[in-house]
Amino acid sequence: MTQYIQGQWLAGEGHEINSKNPANGDVIWQGNTATATQVNAAVDAARAAQFDWFMLGYEARLAIVEAYRAQLEANKAEIAETIAQETGKPQWETATEVGAMIGKIALSAKAHDKRTGTETNDLPAGRAVLRHKPHGVVAVFGPYNFPGHLPNGHIVPALLAGNTVVFKPSELTPKVAELMLKCWDKAGLPQGVVNLVQGEVETGKALASHPQIDGLFFTGSSRTGHILHEQYAGLPGKILALEMGGNNPLIVKGVTDTKAAVHDIIQSAYISSGQRCTCARRLYIEEGAQGDALIAELVKAIKQIKVGAWNVQPQPFMGSMISETAARGMVAAQATLQSLGGVSLVELVQVEAGTGLVTPGLIDVTKVAELPDEEYFGPLLQLVRYSDFDQAIHLANATRYGLSAGLLADSREDYDYFLARIRAGIVNWNKQITGASGAAPFGGVGASGNHRASAFYAADYCAYPVASMEADAVSLPATLSPGLSI
């Protein structure tokens, strides 16, 4: 029973799919995809449930969402282990993901009140009231890299606002999605409020093109996001929120503590095996002896990074990539950069055939004349040496993306200069660029999104404002307009 529609667990009526542990190829979930007919049923269920869910009132909706939080807390060990099994991430990291899922509840409630609450202003003969109403039925498309946390960041604020949801997770992480829906079910969510459709591209197409959805919230690749954007062109009545990737730059300038700089570079480039949308893809280090010393220390540290399966002890820093296909893609990306003149300082290598395990790579692309503006979604960091700060910033901005960027520098003046000129939605100073606060918005510019920041600002795309002029009774004004006699 792989689909959750109208509060019932149903078997998919499409073809068989499975998910595998990318570290060893073991099958950990099997099921069948949702057909277009089942997608229709899920949307119909969400539509039928939506008005009653909205009319239940915010406090009652919040109580159910809080009950879901309690279910996450009660099942956090199982959820963390399942995320680790399906994604290949080490358990220390998946435990933090479940913690973020739990923490999202309070943050979403706070954001709902602050961003989309009700506000009343008195007028001489009445009042002006601002309220917010839900869009209706929204589709949520989840990614594989944070299969719990990222869709959770769309679903929770959508429900608080009064929307109902049809959730289509990544086909690579169906078991995590199944656990999430079991938690919602145990929380007492009314039938039809959240529906789960598992499947691959055809299931996604059926949902994205469904005429009865009022919006779509997507986290994933820029390529897929652009397809969705084209599909929704000419449909201004539907809300589309796109959270996509980036070719993210990290500049190092005048850092005294080189060990700390190395740590932040590694955390920026290689955490989650480089499979975070905010991961550093390009590293800019000054020419000269200080830069040489930093690179030597970085190379040494990269070679010491422990890579292993999600459950090995002691725990590795890097687990598996999501699949063998993804691992091979990174080997191919490295070969492409080498063919263009890049020189590998640390070779990225597939550890074991048939798995997604790879070692981290560092490649010097300073002499590559035309560096591809691609998001290589894995643990491959491109190094560029620069001669002056303006050149580094210019090169950092030479991308169609604009998600995250960072500066490691001792000088506040340098950071202010950088902050004013860099083009990105997340800009960090002396922090890893994979670090972001749930109490702040999360999103980028350019090919990284469509100006619908998520996290604390997710509330904004989950509801629309309703402005009202109100009075308790119909009454004549003290003075009639010229030319009127009543």
Swiss-Prot record:
NAD(+) binds at residues 220-225. It catalyses: N-succinyl-L-glutamate 5-semialdehyde + NAD(+) + H2O = N-succinyl-L-glutamate + NADH + 2 H(+). InterPro entries: Ald_DH/histidinol_DH, Ald_DH_C, Ald_DH_CS_CYS, Ald_DH_CS_GLU, Ald_DH_N, Aldehyde_DH_dom, SuccinylGlu_semiald_DH_AstD. SUPFAM superfamilies: ALDH-like. GO terms for molecular function: succinylglutamate-semialdehyde dehydrogenase activity. The keyword Oxidoreductase applies. Its EC number is 1.2.1.71. It holds the Pfam family Aldedh. The keyword Ligase does not apply. The active site is at 243, 277. One of its GO terms (biological process) is arginine catabolic process to glutamate. Pathway: Amino-acid degradation; L-arginine degradation via AST pathway; L-glutamate and succinate from L-arginine: step 4/5. It comes from the Bacteria. NCBIfam families: arg_catab_astD (TIGR03240), PRK09457.1 (NF006992). Belongs to the aldehyde dehydrogenase family. AstD subfamily. HAMAP family: Aldedh_AstD (MF_01174). This is N-succinylglutamate 5-semialdehyde dehydrogenase. The gene is astD.
